[in-house]
Amino acid sequence: MPAMVPGWNHGNITRSKAEELLSRAGKDGSFLVRASESIPRAYALCVLFRNCVYTYRILPNEDDKFTVQASEGVPMRFFTKLDQLIEFYKKENMGLVTHLQFPVPLEEEDAIDEPEEDTESVMSPPELPPRNIPVSGGPCEAKDLPLPTENPRAPEVTRLSLSETLFQRLQSMDTSGLPEEHLKAIQDYLSTQLMLDSDFLKTGSSNLPHLKKLTSLLCKELHGEVIRTLPSLESLQRLFDQQLSPGLRPRPQVPGEANPITMVAKLSQLTSLLSSIEDKVKALLHEGSESTNRRSLIPPVTFEVKSESLGIPQKMHLKVDVESGKLIIKKSRDGSEDKFYSHKKILQLIKSQKFLNKLVILVETEKEKILRKEYVFSDSKKREGFCQLLQQMKNKHSEQSEPDMITIFIGTWNMGNAPPPKKITSWFLSKGQGKTRDDSADYIPHDIYVIGTQEDPLGEKEWLEILRHSLQEVTSMTFKTVAIHTLWNIRIVVLAKPEHENRISHICTDNVKTGIANTLGNKGAVGVSFMFNGTSLGFVNSHLTSGSEKKLRRNQNYMNILRFLALGDKKLSPFNITHRFTHLFWLGDLNYRVELPTWEAEAIIQKIKQQQYSDLLAHDQLLLERKEQEVFLHFEEEEITFAPTYRFERLTRDKYAYTKQKATGMKYNLPSWCDRVLWKSYPLVHVVCQSYGSTSDIMTSDHSPVFATFEAGVTSQFVSKNGPGAVDSQGQIEFLACYATLKTKSQTKFYLELHSSCLESFVKSQEGENEEGDEGELVVRFGETLPKLKPIISDPEYLLDQHILISIKSSDSDESYGEGCIALRLETTESQLPIYTPLTHHGEMTGHFRGEIKLQTSEGKMREKLYDFVKTERDESSGMKCLKNLTSHDPMRQWEPAGRVPACGISSLNEIINPNYIGMGPFGQPLHGKSTLSPDQQLTAWSYDQLPKDSSLGPGRGEGPPTPPSQPPLSPKKFSSSTANRGSCPRVQETRPGDLGKVEALPQEDLPLTKPEMFENPLYGSVSPFPKLVPRKEQESPKMMRKEPPPCPDPGVSSPSIMLPKAQEVENVKGTSKQAPVPVFGPTPRIRSFTCSSSAEGRMPSGDKSQGKPKAPASSQAPVPVKRPVKPSRSEMSQQTTPIPAPRPPLPVKSPAVLQLQHSKGRDYRDNTELPHHGKHRQEESLLGRTAMQ
């Protein structure tokens, strides 16, 4: 019982919470006992001495006696109870660092108001889920009724008492629906015939003739209906049966006696027939669709677009035929085909980020020339629908046997204990408010559907049938059930395409109760995890505590779920679910509210009507708690652009019901975004949120369903190319000069555990050396003692997709003090590269891990992934939007997570390009001095947290720290492009400016590109194929940190390092301190260099919030070395005044076929907001033979 638990026994509190409580106590000898995190049934005794916490493990033996784990040679003492152990060690000099003196009591605030947690459900009977309790009384009910006791010894009185009891029960029932003759027959049976049947039983007979007579009378009409219905059903069955069964031929119906046995047989036959008919119709329809319609599940879709020819906009039509794998270009919708391109000839889709309806398509002609075609769609949704259809086409006709990308639908809905409407297909089509899918994508089925419900009144089979039927209606496909798991009325269902059935394995389900006293299942979470080929996926559906004032309780709910939900690989015991999965999706009714005074309810309603969501999101509890790193640490959420999903009046979406009369008074439920979808993925893996919104036409609940769809990168079950039995010993992973910084007061030694699926088993290191850090932190250095890791497969296609999980553990208790993740997708092999990951434990930030890594792989290269097919070019307008992936309100901009780092070039293998990674600089460091945002919008990296004090190494692979605002690059290196991610805000992608000659293609619309790497803005990097010269000062001190943020030039003002296209203009650059706007010369190629930040002079102070406007550099500043202009192509020779020869740089490793497409002039829309079809620039279709590029 709780009352008997000693005050010093804190149960399952975390280690960090124990340290906090002891530090708060502040007295030497303060102590508490908590459950061990590493050994079941064991405890940890925590003692404070000289501001350090010492932890002793209390172990049970086979006889359930307790002992404190001691060093070798120290005698062990056993105690039958914990109380006896504590009393013993209160004596001095018993072996502890100090004797136990001051027990730290339990915090009782949670227990005081815990029963009120679900008051709303308890006090609102209509909202309770219905129960299928039989109306007829059972034995328990009969015992509750008083029995007459006048003469208990008379047997006939006993029979009369039973009769009277049943009569009373019949009278208490609602019999208004019974026919009068049926009711009279039942009463007659109870009055006389019940006793006669009783006499039959006493004689040993098993028959109840009078009861049979009663049921025959009641079923008389039913018998006639069955006799009349059966022939019709048999005829219908034969109609759909392909092979006639002799047993089902029509036979003459002989009127039989309406007795119960006959009725049961007939009803059984009727039930069997109905089931058989349904199965046969389903089979017939399925076979018919397979043979006739299956190949046209996705019909051809035509898009009306605009294209320019000689500056004149022309209307065009793009027809996408997914099934035949063709993109058809027509001048009129119903006209003949002008030309078409097969899926193999469509090389790249490049989305403009400045103009969200503009798209560039790179296609290959029959003469092996690369053609760049630019189109403007009617809106951004049409462009997204077109891209999804093209991606589906590439995927459908891919020569790869296994997918490297899947799409996932996530849906969450609090059903309000009401059955759903008949039609819920808008939910699965992502239709309604917010970021929704275009109609053209309706026919594209997702690979996996995950549906989470709360307050779900239906049974599992009933709900599953509704879901499968709705998806069948939407996709014409029957989905396989992967898992279904229910806790109380919290449920999660996972469905997958039939073709993925053999790719899904290791399915695991679990639940955690967080309701009253953490025992009742009125609140909590359910989860499902599984492997999709080589990728681990996890899904959590939670229903957290309600009530605006119970924010801290919700935070605790989240922590409990995080800690105790057992999903995924059991070998990863040191890690919770945030590190066990490549992709983790968290959905549900999280119940976080808009925290505003109740008297502002009507003002909130008006802001919702005016769609001023950002004003309300500034007070959203979940966003504020995430900003403070209290919950969902390192999770991401798409920008919210839909109305609050709670609390509506039922059967309408036009009115919020924000008041509710309770027994305790008026309760306010201000409109809030209670229903959310968040996710967390390993570093350097592809994940893009394609839609996030709520439906508008499903109104049976006071919540609206919420949908989110994702592209997620997956890996295959890789088989080594060395063949069976071959020894793959070329690969090696080496960690060097690693150290961890921990936020702890514990006095103990630490070691590392390294886990990965690319290792045969986990690896344990030697103990590190402890040092005193800043602000009470502890620094643990591992130096050169870490073991070298031997991967099971060293092929780069496999190894570079892997991750290493790191856990730093105490040598005394084997408890983890922090966990992190390092990606092996390195820029180059055979070199030491910096690495970084934040360390977390039970959802709290506990420190950082830094060091260097050296990766050795076998020969090979990375193949192109499907998600590389769609890229996004960046321009300056995107900088102002890219902090909107959390919300659009200003308070969040200081905390916005950056995108994932791109996959970078591998000098000896192949270039790895992925547009959805964290911004990384040279050798994994942030791109210092090459900021893409203004100072107040500096993107942080993976960890989302404050800039660590020691940034000498810079972030490396994995969850990096915030990008320092200004540090010189080591050497020029190519930039990779960014892809569309989170709507208008892609993940920032910055790659190392290291190897000479590797440069990014210009994103100018007419300009042919090197593969899909699109950068047009000098803020983001060089777009010339020529190397960038680095100032001597930067070469001499590549790792010097500077506090000043880099300047962010105005669109019309060139940076000191912007190269002009002509020689005389270059001289002007050297002689001026304030640069004039860059002139745009017709078709003349415009050459750009990297934006330089070689010194701190002329830089704005770190606190400047000038939104990227630069200060003029000092006049004494040395001129920046300038790259030579590009030699124009032959098609442009006639338009240039003075050709300037220049030596060609080394060819990039990847896609040399389109290198020279960088040499033509494109349009520049940075200085105006005019759309491309307004006729200011020339047509940008240029052809260039591949042979000319060698």
UniProtKB/Swiss-Prot annotation:
Chain positions with Phosphothreonine modification: 963
Signal peptide limits: none
Compositional bias segments (type: Basic and acidic residues): 989-998, 1031-1045, 1161-1183
Pfam family, one: C2_SHIP1-2_first
Residues recorded with modification Phosphotyrosine: 917, 944, 1020
Motif SH3-binding 3 positions after renumbering to this chain: 1038-1049
Region ranges (Interaction with DAB2): 1014-1028
Motif NPXY motif 1 location, chain numbering: 914-917
Biased composition (Pro residues): 961-971, 1140-1149
Chain ranges for the short sequence motif SH3-binding 2 as given in the UniProt record: 969-974
Main location: cytoplasm
EC numbers for this chain: 3.1.3.86, 3.1.3.56, 3.1.3.36
Family: Belongs to the inositol 1,4,5-trisphosphate 5-phosphatase family.
Subunit architecture: Interacts with tyrosine phosphorylated forms of SHC1. Interacts with tyrosine phosphorylated form of DOK1. Interacts with tyrosine phosphorylated form of DOK3. Interacts with tyrosine phosphorylated form of SLAMF1/CD150. Interacts with PTPN11/SHP-2 in response to IL-3. Interacts with receptor EPOR. Interacts with receptors MS4A2/FCER1B and FCER1G. Interacts with receptors FCGR2B and FCGR3. Interacts with receptor FCGR2A, leading to regulate gene expression during the phagocytic process. Interacts with GRB2. Interacts with PLCG1. Interacts with tyrosine kinases SRC and TEC.
Protein name (record): Phosphatidylinositol 3,4,5-trisphosphate 5-phosphatase 1
Originating organism: Rattus norvegicus (Rat)
